[in-house]
Swiss-Prot record:
Species the sequence originates in: Halobacterium salinarum (strain ATCC 700922 / JCM 11081 / NRC-1) (Halobacterium halobium)
Name of this protein: Glutamate--cysteine ligase
Gene3D superfamilies: 3.30.590.20
Any one of the GO BP annotations: modified amino acid biosynthetic process
InterPro entries: GCL_type2/YbdK_subfam, GCS2, Gln_synth/guanido_kin_cat_dom, YbdK
Record GO terms (molecular function): ATP binding; glutamate-cysteine ligase activity; ligase activity, forming carbon-nitrogen bonds
Organism lineage string: Archaea, Methanobacteriati, Methanobacteriota, Stenosarchaea group, Halobacteria
Gene field: gshA
Length: 360
């Protein structure tokens, strides 16, 4: 049975970054290429052993090595991307980044042959058949399993903030959805996604994970696709809310923010006299804020966590930067959002320019 172990949670502050990308042709149009890149070729360092298939044959995922902290992340992210772009170029292919590719029509593309994905397609059917999404996943090491669950519970409020800042997928299946992040809505069609309820302890989380596997809800722990989760294999808190990005500086900002959040909450846990007191974060409120994020992107406002009324994204960003000593998310917020950029480019210059804009 593929479930994790509390012993995996042994290191604090380590970092790993997983990015999903689209394989495109010379014109920036999605094309099958993952088999060629993953199985038929020999990926170079630093992506040897860290390049994998995703559900569709035009989507791949990269992983950085385990990093000792956030300071190492920008260089590692760029080294992985440069290696992937060069490797794809050798095969006559290019790489693009976004939550959804505006030129991808899911009925026109093949799914991967990997048995795990074939099993998911059989079990989940339509929601997985149309799942052309690409995301950014950030792992931060936590040295205690109960602490990882406590941190994950509190991280839930911040996932709509990350989603709003990252919103980079207005187009799906050839049309404008009217959303800033259609990826988030498409992905929520799968089971075991979105913002989870709070868990009382690691034992409660592990019992849930084991029960889901034993009774056929999932085949392995990796199919708990929540926006944030304790990863019982890597010993991390994994943040899965953001859309994928073409610009590595935007990825840097989200990595900095996620790492700072996990680090700060981990310290709070160590200082807290009653670590598993009630969090006060209702799932319904979190879902409402996620909807605002996926619909409005940078223009989102959120139901306030501890007071009456709403708070706009800009105010949240200012408070978080001041509280945590980070700056990247302010730069992201001050810039035009990914969704807005895509719409402006398509309206002004057309598809060809948009596809080039999304290419690495």
């Amino acid at each position: 049975m593929d479930v994790g172990s509390p012993e995996a949670f042994s290191e604090s502050g380590t970092l790993g970054v997983e990015e999903e990308f689209f394989v495109v042709d010379e014109h920036g149009v999605p094309t099958a290429g993952s088999d060629e890149l993953v199985y038929e070729g020999e990926p170079p360092e630093p992506i040897a052993g860290r390049l994998d298939h995703e559900l569709f044959k035009f989507v791949v995922e990269t992983q950085t090595p385990t990093l000792n902290g956030v300071a190492e992340a920008p260089a590692a992210i760029r080294e992985v991307r440069a290696a992937l772009v060069a490797y794809a170029s050798e095969h006559g292919l290019r790489i693009a980044g976004a939550g959804l590719h505006p030129g991808a029509r899911w009925r026109e593309h093949e799914h991967a042959e990997k048995p795990r994905y074939r099993s998911q397609l059989d079990r989940i059917q339509y929601p997985q058949h149309r799942n052309t999404t690409a995301g950014l996943h950030i792992h931060v090491g936590v040295d205690d399993p109960d602490k990882a669950v406590w941190v994950s519970n509190r991280m839930r409020w911040h996932m709509p903030v990350l989603l709003a800042l990252s919103a980079n997928s207005p187009y799906w299946n050839g049309f404008d959805t009217g959303l800033a992040s259609a990826r988030a809505k498409i992905f929520e069609g799968l089971p075991n996604t979105g913002l989870p309820t709070a868990f009382e302890s690691y034992a409660a989380f592990q019992a849930f994970e084991r029960r889901m596997v034993e009774h056929g809800g999932i085949e392995d722990r990796g199919e708990l696709w929540y926006d944030v989760r304790p990863h019982s294999g890597h010993g991390t808190v994994e943040v899965r809310a953001p859309d994928a990005q073409a610009d590595p500086a935007v990825v840097d900002a989200f990595v900095e923010y996620a790492h700072a959040l996990v680090t700060e909450y981990a310290q709070r846990y160590d200082d807290h006299p009653d670590p598993f007191s009630v969090t006060g974060l209702r799932r319904e409120l979190l879902d409402a804020n996620k909807w605002r994020a996926m619909r409005d992107g940078h223009d989102a406002s959120f139901v306030a966590r501890e007071t009456q009324g709403a708070v706009d994204l800009g105010t949240v960003v200012d408070r978080e930067c001041d509280r945590l000593g980070v700056s990247g998310i302010r730069d992201v917020y001050d810039d035009v959002s990914g969704a807005q950029q895509q719409r402006r480019i398509l309206d002004t210059h057309g598809e060809k320019r948009l596809y080039n804009h999304l290419s690495l």
